[in-house]
């Protein structure tokens, strides 16, 4: 133990005001345990077994007692194993939506019970999303994840825990101690090297020189250096970024990474986090299970109060970063694949994002989730057969169909699915379907779609309404139908004796000659 750090931890834990004298609805006092480890050595530098003034020796030690870790186990049993095996990268995406039905109910549920749709592993860690953790675990496999957690990170999981729910969500058969959790997380801070936790280095005889007992550091490479770094990067975001669950542990002037944990009905609250100097795990709960009601995660709050004082005189420094083995990729935020024009034309805006990933896990194929579709800007829907060209734009939407679990189970990106657009314009009992604005086509003459207009002829004139085949010449006055006679109408005129046919030539023959001969008296 480090006497200075031990004294700091005890001072915070002896004062129940550190959690505002928190009690349960039935009046139970809150309990907590904390273990602080130096990642580079595995030395336990401080441990406190309960809150409140110490009333005796050999009291119950909540730091070494096993408790349910909740979601704080996910980095150890789902994300780190999958990253280390190359099964996923921080850029890999899964659908944040119930994975399947379990006993007739959509499973798993998130906390809160909302779903966002396609989400990256990085954001799944940051926001502690159950559906992403489960799918990540299933990607690497339950057996591989269990072996990674027990053999590489020293977790005392029961054989019954070799299942999706315990490893993916944290509902363990028995539980884990803060010592185990702190030692396992310390491997992230120690570039992937796990040190067995120890409470002493050596024991001296009364002469203060003779070594009676010595404890050697037992260590092993638990994961790749790149895995440890990428896990740290994601856990750092969980503490420092908006939407992260670990904001209650944050204090200024130090790099911090960590993960919260909560069990059903808020019976257990956990936080395990680390800096470049120390790693600490905190459990909070009641002796008899009761709901913990507190404005923030009380475990994260205690962690911050202790660790801020521990680091008060230490300079800030960055976490260890591998000298090689990492690369930055530009991908589609929804598919995690190489972005296409359709990704950049998404109706929400350009979906291209950058991720740091391990070399060899970067995507090599283009996004297959986004497709370009025609959208009517006036109807705000899929363009139909009657939508004019000037109202149509092309946008990128997600070509994906979700399982229907009822109206109460939705995802926030449902509006950006092609299947949702198609459903909106499908015929119903009360609607013919299609674009609500453009419901029929304009009527045009198929032989003259311009309606008589010749845009290429600047001298074109509209047709004469009395003779549509003859256009009106504006330079030629229209003839008076009355022939200019003030009496109006057609008046009889004497025919031309030299052309009795009136311009018809021999039309009429002898009939015309006889007619005019008889009437002229000749």
Task: Identify what each model region corresponds to.
Residues 3-22, 36, 47, 53-65, ...:
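A penicillin-recognizing enzyme superfamily signal
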Residues 9, 42, 67-96, 124, ...:
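Active-site SXXK
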Residues 22-29:
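Short loop/turn motifs at secondary-structure junctions and domain boundaries
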Residues 30-33, 90, 165, 196-199, ...:
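Envelope-exposed proteins and targeting segments
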Residues 39, 54-55, 83-92, 156-158, ...:
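Secondary-structure transition/capping motifs at alpha-helix termini
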Residues 87-145, 164, 194, 206-237:
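Conserved catalytic neighborhood of penicillin-recognizing serine enzymes
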Residues 106-110, 141-183:
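Mid-domain, small-residue-enriched loop/turn segments at the edges of structured enzyme/sensor domains
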Residues 256-257, 261-522:
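Soluble, non-transmembrane domains of envelope/secretory-pathway proteins that act on or interact
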